[in-house]
From Swiss-Prot:
InterPro entries: Aminoacid_DH-like_N_sf, NAD(P)-bd_dom_sf, THF_DH/CycHdrlase, THF_DH/CycHdrlase_cat_dom, THF_DH/CycHdrlase_CS, THF_DH/CycHdrlase_NAD-bd_dom. This is Bifunctional protein FolD. It catalyses: (6R)-5,10-methylene-5,6,7,8-tetrahydrofolate + NADP(+) = (6R)-5,10-methenyltetrahydrofolate + NADPH; (6R)-5,10-methenyltetrahydrofolate + H2O = (6R)-10-formyltetrahydrofolate + H(+). Pathway: One-carbon metabolism; tetrahydrofolate interconversion. Catalyzes the oxidation of 5,10-methylenetetrahydrofolate to 5,10-methenyltetrahydrofolate and then the hydrolysis of 5,10-methenyltetrahydrofolate to 10-formyltetrahydrofolate. NADP(+) binds at G166, R167, S168, S191, I232. Belongs to the tetrahydrofolate dehydrogenase/cyclohydrolase family. Gene3D superfamilies: Leucine Dehydrogenase, chain A, domain 1, NAD(P)-binding Rossmann-like Domain. It holds the Pfam family THF_DHG_CYH_C. Coiled coil: none annotated. Its EC number is 1.5.1.5, 3.5.4.9. Keywords: Amino-acid biosynthesis, Histidine biosynthesis, Hydrolase, Methionine biosynthesis, Multifunctional enzyme, NADP, One-carbon metabolism, Oxidoreductase, Purine biosynthesis.
Length: 294
């Protein structure tokens, strides 16, 4: 029996609708409009698409959207000055610097300059440290989306065996912490791990975030496992076109797993939706309101 497909589009749309409902409520009850500022340095086409999408979805949720476009040759000091302004702006509750940054800019210093209370990407060392300590924190959006997708299949993750393939600061490491917070039993692996197929076959939950196209094969999977594919690779297709595939061999996984996220249409849909969640949570925390019900 083929696995079920975890539809990220549907789950993300539901999450965005719930965020919009909470925004409407806090506007009505408290006169507060959450605001998200996005900083884009340079003119990378993919980054421009992401920023436009974030702007559109932020406004659709009823939030204020602020875009700051800087040239690729901007000085580090000018980026830091802009972040200082946004930190001090009461209309801005969330700050996101679109990554990657052009060469010559110190990404770590720029991320560290963001007020941790407004760090809706969850990358500031303060938030990363709190997450690692099992404390409440703004969490990176993609791992947060992975947890929500998993919970669409499993009401509780407690006691489940999970493997995270990938150890990046953006996805792998924070995802491990979020899974631990859910009382899952977690193995963290990567492209150089020994006996990786064997490790995967033990797991109820498989998270592939290593950036290697179709690395995880169907015979790596435990029958009935839930598979969350974070990877995204563009490969040639017919008629000179390209298509997107993930880190998991999707057709093979569908014959073994219990549930699988597609690429596209899976994890990617959740990232911006979770950015809206983080912005809403940040706004409520900054303004001293109770945590939103999303």
């Amino acid at each position: 029996m083929a696995a079920s497909i975890i539809d990220g589009k549907v789950i993300a749309a539901d999450l965005r609708a719930r965020v919009a409902g909470e925004v409407t409520r806090i506007k009505r009850d408290h006169g507060l409009t959450p605001g998200l500022a996005v900083v884009l340095v340079g003119n990378d086409p993919a980054s421009e698409v992401y920023v436009r999408n974030k702007h559109k979805q932020t406004q659709a949720a009823g939030m204020a959207s602020f875009e700051h476009m800087l040239p690729a040759d901007v000085a580090q000091a000018d980026v830091l000055a802009l972040i200082a302004e946004l930190n001090a702006d009461p209309a801005v509750h969330g700050i996101l610097v679109q990554l990657p940054l052009p060469k010559g800019l110190d990404t770590e210093a720029i991320i560290a300059a963001i007020d941790p209370a407004k760090d809706v990407d969850g990358l500031h060392p303060h938030n990363a440290g709190r997450l690692a300590g099992g404390l409440s924190a703004l969490s990176p959006c993609t791992p947060l989306g992975c947890i929500i997708l998993t919970k669409s299949v499993h009401a509780s993750l407690e006691g489940l065996d999970a493997i995270v393939i990938g150890r990046s600061n953006l996805v792998g490491r924070p995802l491990v912490q979020l899974l631990l917070n859910e009382n899952a039993t977690v193995t963290i692996a990567h492209s150089r791990s020994r006996n990786l197929p064997e490790l995967c076959r033990r797991a109820d939950l498989v998270y592939a975030a290593v950036g290697r196209a179709e690395m995880v094969r169907g015979d790596w999977l435990k029958p009935g496992a839930t598979v969350i594919d974070v990877g995204i690779t563009r490969v040639p297709a017919a008629e000179g076109k390209t298509r997107l595939i993930g880190d998991v061999a999707f057709d093979e996984a569908m014959q073994v797993a219990g549930a699988v996220t597609p690429v596209p249409g899976g994890v990617g849909q959740m990232t911006v939706a979770c950015l809206l969640v983080n912005t809403l949570r940040a706004a409520c925390a900054i303004e001293g309101l109770s945590a939103p019900g999303v």
